[in-house]
């Protein structure tokens, strides 16, 4: 994004609309700090500039990665899906991605107003990668990895920024305590925030094994969830859904 200095009247109406505070007054002009801007297009789509001075620019790699992770209308070329992640567990009764005894994790790194660099995204991915997890192959962050066994990202995008990015992986129930431990440790080494979602299949007696495990290892959690109600076709005959 850029602001056309010849059209801009310095009315400052656009400044509050940037979630990353990237629109700033500098040398008696209103400019976009390109280091802070995540190319989300919010300033443009807000349509608050009276002279249409806010302009969208053509993005080249690796800067283009900012837009697909931050703009609500951009889509990933590989998956043709907009957004930062996949359907996760929400379509499990159709996809069968998550099986009995497995736990899916969704690490939502960064937030609008805070943002994240892909360096911090990689730090978290590398930390959980050491445990031996299976990164979701259709996840946009996974598609940026050069080594999916470790979680290492491409070197040329590590200093790029985004509102947020979601790391998705699954592992066995037995490795959940180790995942919790490494996430607590890596949280001290990054310069952003992240939230953790986790999911498992429901047992035949209606219990949720993951919640019982969290209680045993004293992990604070909110049990509000997204439940498959069985309206989709059953992909895994004999598996709990």
Predicted regions and their residues:
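Iron-sulfur cluster-binding cysteine motifs and their immediate structural context
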Residues: 2-3, 9, 13-34, 38-62
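Long, contiguous binding/interaction regions
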Residues: 9, 66-101, 125-129, 159, ...
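Structural motif
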Residues: 29, 134-136, 194-195
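Flanking helices and flexible, charged tails adjoining ferredoxin-like Fe-S electron-transfer domains
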Residues: 42-139, 145-152
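Short beta-strand-to-loop capping motifs
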Residues: 109-111, 169-173
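Short, conserved charged micro-motifs
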Residues: 115-120, 173-182
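Cofactor- and metal-binding active-site motifs of prokaryotic enzymes
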Residues: 152-160
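Flexible loop/N-cap segments at domain edges
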Residues: 161-167
């Amino acid at each position: 994004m850029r602001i056309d200095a010849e059209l801009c009247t310095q009315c400052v109406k656009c400044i509050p609309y940037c979630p990353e505070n990237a629109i700033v007054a500098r040398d008696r002009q209103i400019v976009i700090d390109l280091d802070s801007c995540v190319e989300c297009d919010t300033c443009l789509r807000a349509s608050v500039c009276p002279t249409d001075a806010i302009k969208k620019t053509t993005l080249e790699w690796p800067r283009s990665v900012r837009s697909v992770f931050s703009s609500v209308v951009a889509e990933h070329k590989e998956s043709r899906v907009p957004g930062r992640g996949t359907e996760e567990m929400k379509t499990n009764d159709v996809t069968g991605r998550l099986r009995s005894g497995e736990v899916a994790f969704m690490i939502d790194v960064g937030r609008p107003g805070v943002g994240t660099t892909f360096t911090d995204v990689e730090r978290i991915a590398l930390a959980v990668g050491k445990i031996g997890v299976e990164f979701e192959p259709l996840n946009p962050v996974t598609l940026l990895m050069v080594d999916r066994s470790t979680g290492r990202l491409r070197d040329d995008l590590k200093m790029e920024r985004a509102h947020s990015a979601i790391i998705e992986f699954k592992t066995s129930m037995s490795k959940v305590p180790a995942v919790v431990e490494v996430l607590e440790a890596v949280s001290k080494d990054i310069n952003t925030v992240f939230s953790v979602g986790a999911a498992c299949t429901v047992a035949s007696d209606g219990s949720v094994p993951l919640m019982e495990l969290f209680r045993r290892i004293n992990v604070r959690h909110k049990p509000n969830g997204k439940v498959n109600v069985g309206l989709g076709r059953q992909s895994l005959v004999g598996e709990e859904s």
